[in-house]
Amino acid sequence: MELLYENSLYKLKIKNENVTIILADDILRNSLVNKMFLSGINVIALSNKLYTNNLRDELKRLDLNDEVVKTLNCDRIIDTDFKSLSMQDLAYVHIIIGLSKLPKVILLYDILTYLKKDDKDKVIEFLKQRNITIINFTSCEEEFLYCENMIIIDGNKVIMEGLTKEVLKNEKVIRRLGFNLPFVVDLSTQLKLYGVLDKYYYDTEELVVVLCKKVD
């Protein structure tokens, strides 16, 4: 089946039924949910009703396996009453439910921003290990590095697109659009400008190792 969603910003065409879309935006959810349900595409939003008391019971109700829970080490929330969870953990619950459907493609719409950094990193690592295609709509600079390719949209125009590492080299354009560079990219850019580094870095641990060697 093929789903076509179009608004003033972009046109999204999905041909694969094994797709999960996780949204923080209820308005977008309401405009998509009926069409996607008929297309066999899973739509999950923060407003989705949870019919049980905790994540373990919800996964059983949905007849989903607990592979994702075990892989992501979700012991701290697996049996916690939903009513006791923070907004961050509730967002994590919805993402875990979406991942437990083991989609081939997952579209994340402003949802990763809700997560704690450790949880966010675990989700991305899981997706990459399972070779699940990630489409992440975000305005959070630190999330730019999660995907190999990047598209910057302003109004109804595509400003830049290409490999993320190449797009991020256009610092002036990115800042003009109101964004900052991810911290590690910004720091390595400044250090390169002053001759401390000879290239850009996109991984914090790698940059720390290089800087420690220079200090030694």
Model-flagged regions — what are they?
Residues I96-I106, Y114:
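A short, proline-enriched helix->beta-strand linker immediately N-terminal to the Walker B motif
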Residues I14-N65:
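ABC ATPase nucleotide-binding domain signature region
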Residues N131-Y146:
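Conserved H-loop
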